[in-house]
Amino acid sequence: MMILVFWSNYPYEPVCLASHRNNMEASVPKYKKHLPQLGMQKEMEQDVKRFGQAAWATAIPRLEKLKLMLAQETLQLMRAKELCLNHKRAEIQGKMEDLPEQEKNINVVDELAIQFYEIQLELYEVKFEILKNKEILLTTQLDSLERLIKDEI
């Protein structure tokens, strides 16, 4: 049985995935390095504003590397959340299909439908975050390439 656990932006908020339904709540702090990277990136961005672009020319590659690492980890976290939400959505669909005909009263079906749509909304938010982080990855890589070409000329 394989258990994968990913950490969100907050130190005590794990997002868990497991190959077995009973182990969905397991947690291991695998991605704790995400928080220091976020802090370092924000500090460096503030320092660039404070001291100017020319003073930070040598630190730009490091800042780009931090942005890439942070975007990659956040992307991995969002993909894990997406998998978890897809699993929850499939469980709700299974519950709706498995309801015996005599138990298919309106209240139970409505409750399951509400849960399904709430999870669907969360999925849309996660997919939006995935797209945002892909954009960050691509723009950072583009900026890095432009800087390297400019330095070569």
Curated annotation (Swiss-Prot):
The keyword Nucleus does not apply. Disulfide bonds: none annotated. InterPro entries: JMY/WHAMM. Residues 113-151 form a coiled coil. Keywords: Coiled coil. PANTHER family: P300 TRANSCRIPTIONAL COFACTOR JMY-RELATED, WASP HOMOLOG-ASSOCIATED PROTEIN WITH ACTIN, MEMBRANES AND MICROTUBULES. This is Putative WASP homolog-associated protein with actin, membranes and microtubules-like protein 1. It comes from Homo sapiens (Human). The lineage of its organism: Eukaryota, Metazoa, Chordata, Craniata, Vertebrata.
